[in-house]
């Protein structure tokens, strides 16, 4: 799916990306698509939006989706961008300009937006808040803690925060970059890049454990199965929340990402050894 579409008429067919918005927790709403996520965290003083999808569908999915579930997008106060790829930063410029929302992003990714104006045409918010490790974005009594987790991009951010399920506090770990979207096919710099990724995944495993996170969210609905879980919510009744997988399974996610990265890193290390023998 293309990240940047100059002509909206050439955007992918709506049926390939549209998903219904949903109230997932008392104070957290899904306003994303079939593959890419966006989340609206409501507070007593406004809304914290996490990720903004593509330029061509952020209007319908985020603005329209929020309105559909009874939220006013004018109340967006902060927009957190997990990383500066077009499937997450796509609507940030529009939301910043229209609602005067503060945009929070990792420093290296802010630098990328400034360095490549053509790449980020229509999705280049004005440089605003540069995230730092452990920074808290707070509205009212609700806070999102930001963690620097480079790897997917140099400025990737992940988060921990608390939501409410029928009044019961539930802790969330949010992964800001899962795939190996970096130079990974040559020993240099692939081995180093994988180590950066592994270290960040270990860091988030530790943060998730420290906060006793029992929910794992991602900025891709294909990774946390958001769309299917949203359907399950409709028939939940008095049963368990489909998003609450338990602390052990949250840890397993980060173990798997580290293990996959280490396996790929080992292949590059072997490739480097074979190259030196020639």
Regions found by a protein language model. Give the residues of each.
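Active-site neighborhood of phospho(di)ester-bond hydrolases with catalytic His/Asp-centered motifs
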Residues: 50-52, 77-84, 103-106, 148-151, ...
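Active-site environment of divalent metal-dependent phosphoester hydrolases
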Residues: 57, 84-90, 110-113, 154-157, ...
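Active-site HxH/HxHxD metal-binding segment of metal-dependent hydrolases
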Residues: 28, 57-60, 64-136, 231, ...
């Amino acid at each position: 799916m293309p990240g940047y579409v100059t002509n909206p008429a050439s955007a992918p067919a709506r049926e390939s990306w549209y998903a219904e918005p949903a109230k997932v927790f008392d104070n957290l709403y899904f306003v994303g698509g079939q593959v890419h996520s966006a989340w609206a965290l409501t507070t007593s003083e406004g809304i914290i939006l996490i990720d903004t999808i593509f330029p061509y569908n952020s209007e319908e999915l985020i603005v329209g989706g929020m309105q559909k579930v009874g939220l006013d997008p004018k109340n967006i106060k902060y927009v957190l961008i997990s990383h500066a790829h077009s499937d997450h930063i796509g609507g940030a410029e529009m939301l910043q300009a229209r609602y005067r929302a503060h945009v929070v992003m990792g420093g290296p990714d802010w630098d990328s937006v400034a360095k490549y104006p053509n790449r980020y045409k229509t999705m280049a918010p004005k440089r605003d808040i540069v995230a730092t490790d452990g920074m808290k974005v707070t509205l009212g009594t609700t806070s999102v803690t930001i963690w620097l987790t480079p790897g997917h991009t140099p400025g990737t951010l992940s988060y921990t925060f608390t939501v409410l399920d029928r009044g019961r506090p539930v802790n969330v770990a949010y992964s800001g970059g899962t795939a190996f979207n970096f130079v990974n096919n040559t020993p240099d710099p692939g081995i180093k890049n994988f180590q950066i990724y592994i270290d960040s995944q270990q860091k988030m495993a530790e943060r998730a454990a420290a906060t006793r996170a029992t929910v794992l969210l991602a900025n891709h609905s294909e990774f946390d199965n958001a769309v299917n879980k949203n359907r399950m919510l409709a028939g939940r009744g008095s049963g368990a929340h489909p998003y609450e997988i338990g602390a052990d399974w949250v840890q397993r996610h980060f173990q798997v990402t580290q293990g996959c990265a280490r396996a790929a890193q080992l292949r590059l290390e072997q490739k480097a050894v074979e190259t030196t023998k020639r």
